[in-house]
Amino acid sequence: MRRALLPAFVLISVLLEGCATLISEPPEQVVLPYVTNFSYSQPADGMPNGWRPWTLSRFKKATEYKLVKEDGQTVIRARASSSASGLVHPLNLNPAQYPLLHWRWKVDQLIAQADNTRKSTEDAPVRLVISFEGDLEKLEFDDRMFFDQIKAFTGQQLPYATLMYIWGNRLPRDTVLSNPHTSRIKMLVVESGRDRVGRWREEMRNVYEDFKRAFGEAPGRITAIGIMTDTDNTGENVHAYYGDIAFKKVAPPRVVFGAD
């Protein structure tokens, strides 16, 4: 069952990019209950531990991802030029126990023509993509039919739900967008505009609460997380950086002894 995680992530790319070509299934990989830090790797390692390439299509140019040193710490540098691909990390995580997602990223410039409300210009300088398990029998009729069509066409099952955190151009922060093909893929705008371009941004989101807001229900287990920088729709060039990604527990309330 766990071998289907990465192909399922590739299926998400079918919906993101309008492409129906899948990559071959990767070798067996241990599924961890945590995200392996980029900072644990060295630039000479090539690919960060625990992560694998996420190829959207053999007909699309791949974004370049490289381990580099930035301010003395190993991070991922993404360079996109009319390209779209990502890195994916399989997971087995309960978001009810570890609801807080902490990460940092940096964007050197925005994608001028990008508009995440339109399929023809739906690019983003940075994305975090999270897939979730769930009961497929609970899906709406239209979604179930769409899932069945994808499975019949590709032989693989889509994740029950997918939540993406993105950096947009103009949309207000916290805007939630739906995929035009299915209600089971949502985008949430975490950063927007030029004000914070060129600086590392520390982000913290409650994935459990964000999922409930986006999908109207509690999330199932998290099966994978990915990063993606894409400019294939706009044909532009963009550089971006990703730092460590971690799921954390909510800190217990602080007890002050002696207080009235």
Positions of the model-derived regions?
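Short carbohydrate-recognition loop motifs
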Residues: T63-S85
